[in-house]
Amino acid sequence: MTITLCGGGNLGHVLAGYLSSQPGTTVSLLTSRPSAWSSSLEVSDSQGRIYRGSLQQISANPADVIPTAQIVLLCLPGYAFQSVMEAIAPYLSPSTWVGSVVSSTGFFFQAGCHLPPGQPLFGFQRVPFISRIAEYGHRAELKGYKDSLSVAVLPPTSESSESGAAMLSHFLSLFHVPVRRLDSIYQASLSNSNPLLHTSRLYTLWHNWQPSITYPDCPMFYSDWTLEASHLYLAMDDELQHLARILGLPPGSIPTVLDYYESTDAESLTAKLRSIQGFRGIPSPMRQTDAGWQPDLQSRYFHEDFPCGLRYPWQLARQHSLATPNIDKVYHWGMKMINSTQ
C-alpha cells in the first residue's frame, strides 16, 4: 500500500513513523520543510514500544508524491486545507482515497469545493493518537492510543467500487483497533472535541481579557481545568446534540461529552480532564511579555478552533434557525479576539 501524508505537525510525525513501520506499507511525505526531515523516523510510546520507519520520498512538490499514492492523508490545521487541496488536486487519481486525520475543521466541506468531483473521501471523527514532536523531522512521542476509531466515508463504501472499499479497509486495519463506519459525514464534521473543548476553556480563561491585562503565570490547559469551563463545555455540547437531532442523525451518533469522558456531571468531568495522562504538561496558549503573561492570539487554538472548528456548528445552526446561545457567545468572542490582531 502506498500512502502519502500531507503535513508535518505533531500528528504528521507520529503517523509518518507509525505507518511506515507497518509491514507492506510505503509512506511518502508532502511538507513545506523537506530538508528538515530524515528519511528514518522513530516514534516511542509511554509503554516503551518503539516504532521505526523509513519514508520513501520527502518533498514540497505534490508532483513527486501524490500521483502514485493510493491513500492521501491530510495531517493539517483547517486553515491549510484549501491551499493543500488545490495543490494536490491535479495529481490525484480518481480512485485515490483522500482523508483527514481531523475532520471537525471543515474537511468534508472544503473538499467539496477544492477537490475533483467524486473524489473518494474519508475522515476520522477523532484523532487516532495523542501526538507530540520530540525532535522535528526525526523523533516523536505517541502519548496516547484510542481503543476504537470512527470514520466517515464519502461516498459510502456501499457506493464505492469493491476494490476501493477494500483498499480503505486495509488502510484502517493498520491502526489495529476496531473501526466503526459512521452513518453521515456530519458525525465526523460536527465534533464536541477540540471545537468545543478548546473554545470553552479559552473563553472561561480570558473572556474578560483586555490588552492592558497581564497574568503572573501560565496555567496548564488541562491539568488546571476549571468547573466553570466544564459547565460551559457541557452547555455547548447540549446545543450541538440538539443540532445533530435537527440534522437527522441517530441518537448517540455523536457521543455526548459525559459519555465520551465517562463522567456524570461537571464536577466529575473536571476531575477527568485534569487527570488524563496524555494531556499532562500542555500549557495554555500564552506568550510571555516583560510585564507578565498574555493570551497568544496567534496560536492554533484561536486560528483553528474558532474559524475552522466552531464555525461549522455555528453556521449550520443559523441555517436551520436553531438557537445556540452558548455556542454563539463563544464563537463571536473568539472571532473578535482573532480580528483584534489583524
Predicted regions and their residues:
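Short acidic low-complexity segments
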Residues: S54-T68
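Active-site-lining helix/loop region of Rossmann-like oxidoreductase modules
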Residues: V151-V257
